[in-house]
Amino acid sequence: MKLSHLALVELLQKAYSAERAAAFAYIGHAGSLKAADAKMAVKKIEDDEWEHRENILRLMEQYEVPISRAYEVRFYVIGKIISASCYVIGRFMPFFFAGKLESGNVCEYFRMMQHFHSLGIREHDEMLYAMGMKEKEHEVYFLEQIKTDRLLPLFERLFSWGSGKTANDVNLENKIPVGNSDQYCKPSDERR
């Protein structure tokens, strides 16, 4: 079945390429860290990003969505630049910006689910839910690493993400079940 839902096609293409950029960034991030446990944690997050990319590719193949060459090139370059920069920008910024990025990524998967639902397709709910929750776990991990850093209040004000600010409405302590999770990541006027 070929998708004719342009917003969903674009979201799949962008997410597919952005997952590779994130994985590249985490290679540099892990490499720049000194503590073995932190290196392993970021490496695990990198592995999750590669797995998400594979899952998205399967969806794209199932619905005949072509890979966007433009996104692939753009996000390849972005990922490599971020990866290299991790070695020179200190400890705080890679954790902060990774957390901010993951915060936005959470909603990608719930928006995909909403778009699929608009087409009457629910067979991917479990996978999309799991990927959205995994991105939230990543966000929480990165914030935990910098929660006491003296730079956090300044960066939180400048970039609208941190201890009191997030780009999604997912709460790992009070998860909405998969069957109702299309409530996540809607504009506030659409939430019930």
Task: Report the location of each language-model feature.
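Non-heme di-metal
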Residues: 1-192
